[in-house]
Amino acid sequence: MAQEETRQRFALVAGEASGDLLAGLLLDGLKTRWPQMQAVGIGGPQMLRRGFESWWPQEKLAVRGYVEVLRHYAEIAGIRRQLKARLLREGAELFIGVDAPDFNLDLEAGLRERGMKTAHFVCPSIWAWRPERVQKLRAAVDHVLCIFPFEPALLAKQGIAASYVGHPLANVIPMAPDRAAARTALGLDAEAPVVALLPGSRRSELRYLGDRFLAAAALMQQARPELRFVLPALPSLRGEVEQLIAGSAMKGRVQLIDGRSHAALAACDVTLIASGTATLEAALFKRPMVIAYNMNPMSWALMRRKQLQPWVGLPNILCGEFVVPELIQEAATPQGLAEATLAWLASPDKVHALQQRFSALHAELQRDTPTLCADAIQKVLEG
């Protein structure tokens, strides 16, 4: 058995920061189950810390929106072709696509056609945006690792094998975050009201939301001079964020921190945040938020036609109602964003009720994700 384990090789692709975090926890489970395993493909810093060998920088795939993807399509398609060829040439027991369905599903289908077993971690949001992906998913994967409890039953109806593994973030983020410790770590005043600005982890998001968030922050500070602002930025985007801040009315008034979005969310009283996985992180930190979403108008028009639910933000989708405000496209004005964010600071009773709701959601998502992932992967390998 030990000799067999030395040959265990997994290939993974995580296309953005949120996928990197999920994949890091997946690798924890795989490493515990198969201590001698190797993992290769495309990943970010969380994966690299666990010994992952990344063949391309993760940032190459971190593009969002139809128009934005078209701009980079040739490069992304080239990476996918080269990756597929190398995996088929060098071999792997299993390919696991971590989120990034636009990139991974085609790759998974191509590898599966050639006999490689495949799994997908994070069910594509067929229940929210893209129902046509069901057929593609069925053809592409042997198994889906689902992070939301209602997804396996939906996939079973479509003949797709799936397991609920819990949401890894629910184990990473404490049930009762330590605001005081986070503020001490960031050098923030213990009593000052703090707003966390999270305009997104992709360049396209930063382009559409960065200026708006900073303009909203300026309006908030005019209304409440005692406010403090923190903005976590990935190292790869720090230069661009610094330029945005320097050219805004918030120059010298925003504390820019490297990565550490969790520290910012733990420390803050409220967050102004781009739609995406970070909104679920904010919910697990029990923080009130205002969700913003802005992209190329053509991309939004195409996406809106495929929308199946009235919500965009994950906290609202999971709660089945608007528990936090969403300001989308034209509604995401600096004035609107500022007013909605300040409203939370003036409504402690509403904040308390929201925290109770988010605590229940946290408990529902909390599972032993690394072990459940390894269990599911082992079944695929043995199947």
Where are these regions (language model features)?
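Nucleotide-activated sugar donor-binding and catalytic core shared by glycosyltransferases
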Residues: 1-383
